[in-house]
Amino acid sequence: MDSQQKVLNAFIGKVVRKDLAFLVKGGLPVPTYVLEYLLGQYCASDDEEIINEGLEKVKDVIKNNYVHRAEAESVKGLIREHGKHRIIDKVTVVLNEKNDEYQATFANLGLSGVPIGTDYVRKNPKLLSGNGVWCIVTIGYISGEDVKVRWEIQTLKPIQISNIDLQEYIEQRKNFTTEEWIDLLMHTVGLNPDTMNRREKFITLARLLPHVENNFNFMELGPKGTGKSHVFQELSPYGVLVSGGDVTSARLFVKMQGNKEILGLVGYWDVVAWDEFEQQKGRAVDAVLIDTMQNYLANKSFNRGKGTHEASASMVFVGNTKHTVPFMLKNTHLFESIPTSFIKGAFLDRIHLYNPGWEIKMLKKDSFSKGYGLITDYIAAVLHALRNDDRTAVLKDYAKFDGSLSERDHLAIRKTFSGMMKLIYPDGKMTDEEAYELVDFAAECRKRVKDQLYVIDETFMAEPARFKYINLKTGIEMNVETLEEVSNPFKSPVSFSKEENADSLQTNEEASEDHSNGENISDSHGTKRPRIPILQEKSMTFRMGQTGVSYEKLFASY
């Protein structure tokens, strides 16, 4: 049985062919999870006939119920003529204190001030977040005289799965190999696993960490077109993506409305992703935002207005790089493209993971999945539920990190390890080799942050961290290196990853002594000949994705 058939058998009614959303989306400005919510109702099968029939039904639903802004007046007329009509639209709710009622605004239909029942708001507090929630709404029209508001909300259902059986999901893990499970997650996020190596899959999975870990501080910078913001925009109704130009302290954290405090996005969403996180000409970042952000990233709380507020939302920063990695390592640093106001140690030290977006290939036609993956609102609900499962303590069974690491270093590594474990091994069953793969990845992604801090803020040089650990299963000391560190000759000012042992030092001394008499030697006839160095037999290991290696560099001297 192939892995795709395993998926269909294990998750009956919870899978969908991932290219179907593209077939129905067209130019609609609708997240994938909205479309797959509909596809999951009609196309959750591998039977071509059922899929084709379901596709037509979904297309009919979109045609008849999705509100295009250009057709808003026609839809209003339809509602008036028929008395009611079901629509798909993005709904935002505010409290009208004067009337003592909640009122809804419809993004595409163009209606505002529509009364909405308190029960809907209590069950779906994200309606109040100011960012809007995609919903299926039956909206009615009230005829007659002396009617203050003609429109009424008869039914409202947010487009997301209502409940899941988390234990059933975890139980199915045993039916898949690790490679099959990772590939299932790749298909689920809409990508073709056949176009990626294992490291690229890990980097892609890391984008899910903010969804599965509370208060996870994530950053990814890389070239354009590599899918950095895709997961945060399309995957989950529990996350929100905001453009860099629209980010304010009031919108993110809390705003004052008279004497009343209105919570911002972090109070309602699992993930708040800051897109286009890069320096923009002529635009300065509010100092209050930076201070509030730093406090939140460190303490999971923020002080605005009268009190202190706590939240569990993960913060994500994604943006484009301006130069190649070798250029940045040699001339600047790997944070060079972010807003200048954020290039300071106090902020960057709070980042748990720096994902190397430059290692992901630009997305092309064959990069997208045409296979079966879990329906996005189902996996989003699973990840949401897994946020309550803390696996950080498991790390201590495998590794003891050097005492030179700061508490923030330890916390970052623990949280990344915990999140990756929940994603790949939700049942907790993994081999030692698999566990140390997670340890190394987690430590590398934190070391990437720390290496750049030495360049940006020299005060970190006073107590440099040695990124190494004792493997508690073997007792062997292991060094941690970033891939760009081994691929490029331009290192951070402080690096303990390649400490030479006594044998290598002795070999170097011997080699130095061999060459101390000059570059040339004379034969018995007095003819000058170039000295041939004494070469040592050795073996070399290269990491997946490592660059800077050539045949000439390896073998020319031999």
Name the predicted role of every residue range.
Residues 1-188:
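Extended, charged/polar low-complexity intrinsically disordered regions
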Residues 171, 175, 197-201, 369-372, ...:
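Conserved phosphate/pyrophosphate-binding and hydrolysis machinery centered on Walker-type P-loop NTPases
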Residues 192-327, 331-334, 349, 470-496:
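Conserved ASCE/P-loop NTPase catalytic core
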Residues 194, 217-220, 360, 388-392, ...:
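Intrinsically disordered or highly flexible coil/loop and linker segments, enriched in small
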Residues 234, 377-380, 443-450:
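Eukaryote-specific, cytoplasm-facing alpha-helical/coiled-coil scaffolding segments in long proteins
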Residues 307-315, 320-428:
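Phosphate-sensing "switch" segment of ASCE/P-loop ATPases
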Residues 399-515, 520, 524, 544:
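C-terminal alpha-helical "lid" subdomain
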Residues 526-557:
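Short amphipathic alpha-helical interface segments
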